[in-house]
Amino acid sequence: MAATDVRPKITLACVECKERNYITKKNRRNNPDRLEMKKHCPRCNSHTAHRETR
């Protein structure tokens, strides 16, 4: 059942240092591609792009 969930939990990882900082949910019907957001990375101490990891 969890594999076909419409709003699965995803993990966002920093593009620069690869640290997994955020967990969020996304709607798989509206956003089938990988999600990318600009968020604050505490390790880099700056706003960087965070991409969805699998």
Swiss-Prot record:
Lineage: Bacteria, Bacillati, Actinomycetota, Actinomycetes, Kitasatosporales
Bias type Basic and acidic residues, positions: 30-39
GO cellular component labels: cytoplasm; ribonucleoprotein complex; ribosome
Protein name (Swiss-Prot/TrEMBL): Large ribosomal subunit protein bL33B
Protein family per UniProt: Belongs to the bacterial ribosomal protein bL33 family.
Region of interest (Disordered), residue spans: 28-54
NCBIfam families documented for this protein: PRK00504.1 (NF001764), PRK00595.1 (NF001860), rpmG_bact (TIGR01023)
PANTHER family associated with the record: 50S RIBOSOMAL PROTEIN L33, CHLOROPLASTIC, LARGE RIBOSOMAL SUBUNIT PROTEIN BL33C
Listed Pfam families: Ribosomal_L33 (PF00471)
Keywords assigned by UniProt, alphabetized: Ribonucleoprotein, Ribosomal protein
Gene3D superfamilies on file: Ribosomal protein L33
BP term (GO), one: translation
UniProt keyword annotation of Protein biosynthesis present: no
Top-rank lineage group of the source organism: Bacteria
GO molecular function, one term: structural constituent of ribosome
